[in-house]
């Protein structure tokens, strides 16, 4: 058995979602080397794991772009810097101080870094599962799913989508032309989503492409051997209906956990890490946080804000790694992409 490797880098980036990938790009633009570490076995974070085919509408310059396409573009952007990755690894330990950190993974690797960027999204995440009898068996066959990776997998199916927020409505709209039938179940009469999504939902309901079932909530599953034959829904008054569906997609949000990160000595609040807005530095000097995990007054949990935070963190890190080199701000149109580090 060989010893696990020891790696050295300027900046260790924990999390390889959009914010982490762009932080690696910004480090490269400042001629800082970086290393990406992620618990998933691929880069992309939630964009890759949860909605690779779901269109994203608020990325500047892209009227609509799928999660997978966004990640592909970010990978192309960092390609000139040949950023190494440790995928399928969880960072368990962090020790040291500003300018000299040591990180340890659950696979035994040791990483020495001058600074650390935490781009861990909401940390480890998983779906909030509905409390339904026999749920495990239907999950095992794929009759109940919490993520849509390929819309084509739902062609010709009868789908119950449960939830009242953006995810439920977005997927109802995205699947309405694939599915034979879609029921959208919500325990309240009103949905909470972007105004444009609500407008499109009203159009789809009027056209008969989606049927709203309100105010109902999930009550039971019908079927044998993991084959779903119907979803039972009920009102608070006890009125029940059976919807003859063969797929159930519950969208009740994600449960999140920072895991070991919460025990590294920096402040944390409900799976987020407070940072200085101008630099994204945490209360642990030399450790920065960007993307959804970063918290400060006025924070918007948008991908594009994570991009901005990655740039701010990289610029704040430069004097830590290159204390004797002055950093003169330049536009990328002027300096281009630096040669590989």
Curated annotation (Swiss-Prot):
List of residues binding FAD: 38, 46, 51, 91, 125, 292, 333
EC numbers: 1.18.1.2
Ranges in coiled-coil conformation: none
Leading EC class: oxidoreductase
UniProt keyword list: FAD, Flavoprotein, NADP, Oxidoreductase
Reaction(s) this enzyme catalyzes, per UniProt: 2 reduced [2Fe-2S]-[ferredoxin] + NADP(+) + H(+) = 2 oxidized [2Fe-2S]-[ferredoxin] + NADPH
One GO MF term attached to the UniProt entry: ferredoxin-NADP+ reductase activity
A Pfam family recorded for this sequence: Pyr_redox_2
InterPro entries: FAD/NAD-bd_sf (IPR036188), FAD/NAD-binding_dom (IPR023753), Fd--NADP_Rdtase_type_2 (IPR022890), Ferredoxin-NADP_redctase_2 (IPR050097)
CC cofactor: FAD
Note accompanying the cofactor annotation: Binds 1 FAD per subunit.
Signal peptide: none
Family of the protein in this entry: Belongs to the ferredoxin--NADP reductase type 2 family.
Oligomer status and interactors: Homodimer.
Protein name as catalogued: Ferredoxin--NADP reductase
Species this chain originates from: Gluconacetobacter diazotrophicus (strain ATCC 49037 / DSM 5601 / CCUG 37298 / CIP 103539 / LMG 7603 / PAl5)
